[in-house]
Amino acid sequence: MEEKLKKTKIIFVVGGPGSGKGTQCEKIVQKYGYTHLSTGDLLRAEVSSGSARGKMLSEIMEKGQLVPLETVLDMLRDAMVAKVDTSKGFLIDGYPREVQQGEEFERRIAQPTLLLYVDAGPETMTKRLLKRGETSGRVDDNEETIKKRLETYYKATEPVIAFYEKRGIVRKVNAEGSVDNVFSQVCTHLDALK
């Protein structure tokens, strides 16, 4: 299993809130048959499963604390091991959020093939999030909160991008255009992996 994970394509997908990375991940799954793993979704699924690990996570999250890195990695690893035989590769969405997370992932799972950086400017992301807020009812889609989320995102992500740029595996896509325009850039990078 270890060997299989080391040979499979693993793509970290990084982009700010409202950059459109979720949409791009869906399109990649449809076209390339990759498995889309979002740490947020994995955590939520574990909590609602009512497992022992889920109960522990629920308590941590209710206190507003960060879930331990080890737990997140165990969940990612379990999800990858479960799918490694049938998947063409993995999209790890919104991870790593800091350099240490990336290093731990490599130590415990495998090295990423590349980091796809879905890059939209702060004005674009804000506009998209406010638009989404009109229909989503998500409490975190208001201007004040969006500003804070973007600040947090930039502070956390810049060192991660720099870390992987040194290795030459960052592929940046300009996410200002239409969904299809952005996806054609994504395809160029993914097609080059074959």
Swiss-Prot record:
Localisation per UniProt entry: Cytoplasm
Entry EC no(s): 2.7.4.3, 2.7.4.4, 2.7.4.6
Pfam families membership: ADK
Enzyme class: transferase
Sequence positions that bind AMP: T39, R44, Q65, L66, V67, G94, Y95, P96, R97, Q101, R138, R149
Gene Ontology MF terms in the entry: adenylate kinase activity; ATP binding; deoxyadenylate kinase activity; nucleoside diphosphate kinase activity
Post-translational modification Phosphoserine, affected residues: S38
Catalytic activity: a ribonucleoside 5'-phosphate + ATP = a ribonucleoside 5'-diphosphate + ADP; AMP + ATP = 2 ADP; dAMP + ATP = dADP + ADP; dATP + AMP = dADP + ADP
Binding residues annotated for ATP, in chain numbering: G18, S19, G20, K21, G22, T23, R132, G177
Annotated PROSITE patterns: ADENYLATE_KINASE
Cited InterPro entries: Adenylat/UMP-CMP_kin, Adenylat_kinase_CS, AK1, AK1/5, P-loop_NTPase
NMP: annotated segments: 38-67
Region LID: start-end pairs: 131-141
Keyword RNA-binding: no
Gene Ontology CC terms: cytoplasm; cytosol
Domain of life: Eukaryota
Disulfide bonds: none
Main location: cytoplasm
Domain notes: Consists of three domains, a large central CORE domain and two small peripheral domains, NMPbind and LID, which undergo movements during catalysis. The LID domain closes over the site of phosphoryl transfer upon ATP binding. Assembling and dissambling the active center during each catalytic cycle provides an effective means to prevent ATP hydrolysis.
Identification of the protein by name: Adenylate kinase isoenzyme 1
Lineage: Eukaryota, Metazoa, Chordata, Craniata, Vertebrata
Gene: AK1
